Regions:
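Compact soluble domain cores
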Residues: 5-71
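Short, compact, well-ordered microdomains
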Residues: 63-100
Length: 100
C-alpha cells in the first residue's frame, strides 16, 4: 500500500538477491527445468515487478531504498509465481502464492 508521503515517481535502486531458493512445490513443478526461472529472476533483479498492481510496484520501488521486502509476481506455464526478496537481502525465495 502506498503511504501518503510516497512519491509515485521514485526510481528503484539496485539490490542484491542473497541466497536464491525455491520451494518444493516450484521444484516439483519445474521437474529439473530450472532455466525457465531465469527470465523471471532477471526481471525481478532489474526492478520489473511483473503482474502486480501500480500500488505494489511503487511500494517495491520504495522498498529498494528503505530496506523492505520486495515481492514480484509472474506467470510460468499458466501458473502464478512469486519472487520475494527479504528486507535484509539475505534470501530470495521463488514460490507459488499458495505456499506463502
Amino acid at each position: 500500500m502506498i503511504k501518503p508521503s510516497q512519491d509515485e515517481n521514485i526510481t528503484p535502486k539496485a539490490f542484491t538477491l542473497g541466497a536464491l531458493v525455491i520451494t518444493r512445490g516450484v521444484d516439483a513443478f519445474l521437474d529439473g527445468n530450472y532455466g525457465a526461472l531465469f527470465p523471471m529472476i532477471n526481471r525481478h533483479i532489474n526492478c520489473d515487478w511483473g503482474d502486480c498492481s501500480k500500488e505494489d510496484a511503487i511500494s517495491n520501488n520504495w522498498a529498494t531504498h528503505r530496506g523492505e521486502r520486495i515481492i514480484s509476481s509472474y506467470e510460468l506455464q499458466g501458473e502464478k509465481i512469486w519472487i520475494i526478496t527479504e528486507w535484509d537481502r539475505s534470501v530470495t525465495t521463488i514460490l507459488f502464492p499458495y505456499e506463502y
